[in-house]
């Protein structure tokens, strides 16, 4: 007996890669999902900085004008590092081919935050904390986009109910057509759930006594550990160095950076300030939304 019809759009959303077509112009569902992730991430950043005694309006503007391009460039450059052969043979095709890598975006976004801290005269640990606080929600929403687009797909599985991709437009079937209708681990959804757990932990830490830099250090140390575990479910062996995938190598670098930030945070010894009266929704409405 077939299940109820109402849940089909939810359970089969990964088989609706294309949102709409207009002539030769294609809009993938991934695009709006990433826009939602970025909107909430940048709105969160404006709120967190204002909550911490900073200028939320400046954070909103800086996010759109500097952090956003830095994240996109970082994601794209990290992805291109895995296509060096094609980049040498056909540079234009390699550059125009879609592909992004989260760890590159983390590096790009953190670099932009450090530049912004220098320009604005803000403690760099505060801006790194701001970036770190936005990451779990942004990644949770962004991985839903990956789930729908069919990128970052999981390994074949028979131990748990798997996702079956049937939409020929999905990236997994364009890259690996033999995986059509094969049950796969829902790797992007696993990441979304783990990210929501990290968001819950970060939210509980908000009013706890802590030094500046603790959020950034925690994210940079915890994210790689989680990524190492999740790599077991992903079907991506590109850029291997021995037993390490490219994602694991980036994760090791981020973990080392996190340990360094923990050291600086402890040496710095500046307690984080916060104002519980600052509302996320009012900050988003007053500081972020008017920019659109």
Q: Whereabouts are the PLM-identified features?
A:
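Hydrophobic, membrane-interfacing alpha helices
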Residues: 1-292
């Amino acid at each position: 007996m077939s299940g109820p019809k109402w849940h089909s759009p939810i359970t089969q959303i990964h088989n609706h890669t294309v949102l709409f077509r207009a002539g030769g112009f294609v809009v993938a569902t991934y695009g709006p999902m990433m826009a939602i992730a970025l909107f909430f991430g940048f709105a969160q950043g404006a709120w967190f900085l204002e909550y911490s005694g900073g200028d939320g309006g400046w954070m909103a503007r800086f996010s759109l004008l500097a952090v956003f391009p830095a994240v996109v460039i970082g994601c794209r450059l990290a992805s291109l590092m895995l296509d060096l052969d094609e980049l040498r043979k056909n540079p234009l095709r390699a550059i125009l081919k879609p592909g992004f890598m989260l760890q590159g975006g983390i590096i790009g976004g953190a670099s932009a935050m450090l530049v912004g801290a220098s320009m604005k005269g803000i403690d760099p640990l505060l801006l790194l904390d701001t970036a770190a606080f936005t990451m779990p929600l942004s990644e949770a929403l962004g991985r839903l986009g990956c789930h729908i687009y069919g990128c970052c797909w999981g390994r074949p599985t028979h131990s748990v109910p798997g996702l079956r991709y049937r939409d020929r437009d999905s990236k997994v079937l364009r890259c690996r057509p033999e995986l059509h209708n094969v049950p796969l681990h829902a790797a992007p959804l696993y990441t979304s759930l783990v990210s929501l757990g990290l968001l819950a932990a970060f939210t509980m830490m908000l009013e706890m006594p802590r030094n500046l830099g603790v959020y950034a250090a925690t994210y940079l140390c915890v994210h790689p550990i989680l990524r190492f575990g999740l790599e077991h479910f992903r079907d991506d062996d590109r850029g291997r160095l021995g037993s390490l995938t490219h994602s694991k190598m980036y994760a090791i670098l981020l973990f080392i950076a996190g340990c360094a930030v923990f050291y600086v945070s402890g040496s710095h010894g500046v307690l984080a300030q916060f104002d519980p009266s600052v509302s996320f929704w009012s900050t988003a409405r007053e500081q972020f939304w008017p920019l659109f």
